[in-house]
Design a protein with these regions (language model features):
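N-terminal leader/auxiliary helical segments
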Residues: 1-190
């Protein structure tokens, strides 16, 4: 999954999910400078530190993999999201999990208490908006998890109708690995 704020009212552009998009393009220093202050002043320092460290892991993974993914997009013509999804799926298969059935957001547990820890990391984002983003993440992941062929067809057709297919179809796990991504999944594994 990506930055939490992407999932706030994900089907419409708004200041909160635009912040998620903008942060994805910013230097990490912007977030980490704020995060340091948030952790130092947090009522529950352990919870705030846990969130900050999770963000560090995500940042390190993106920083390491995105240059390769973007080069592979140019080489293969496969979209960024699909390459990342295929890599995730290859790792799940290696661990004996079925990527079509495994719920990838099962670790997200929306609660007001957690939202109170997370919200201060994002300037101008409220606890209610953070909680809604957490719930939105669960909803979007349930929507995109299309183990049933009929649901898969409905989801992908809906993306086409909404004009979002090119950007979003790669977020829906393929029933079989995309042969164009096998090489990228093997290289990604070696670089991480």
């Amino acid at each position: 999954s990506d930055l939490l704020m992407f999932y706030y009212k994900a089907l419409q552009s708004n200041p909160v999910n635009r912040l998620g998009n903008a942060m994805h393009e910013q230097k990490g220093e912007v977030f980490f400078t704020r995060a340091r202050t948030v952790v130092e002043n947090a009522p529950d320092k352990d919870a705030a530190l846990a969130y900050a460290l999770g963000f560090v892991c995500h940042f390190a993974l993106d920083s390491t993999c995105h240059p390769y993914v973007e080069a592979y997009v140019r080489e293969s013509g496969v979209g960024h999201c699909e390459i990342e999804t295929e890599f995730d799926n290859a790792l799940m298969r290696e661990d004996g999990l079925d990527p079509i059935k495994f719920f990838t957001a099962s670790h997200i547990k929306p609660s007001r208490e957690r939202a109170e820890v997370i919200a201060p990391f994002y300037e101008g984002v409220t606890v209610d908006e953070t909680l809604a983003a957490m719930k939105g993440m669960i909803t979007v992941h349930h929507l995109l998890q299309a183990a049933n062929p009929v649901k898969r067809w409905v989801v992908l057709t809906g993306m086409r109708v909404a004009g979002k297919y090119e950007f979003m179809h790669g977020l829906v796990a393929n029933p079989q690995p995309n042969p164009k991504c096998v090489q990228s999944s093997q290289k990604d594994r070696k670089s991480t």
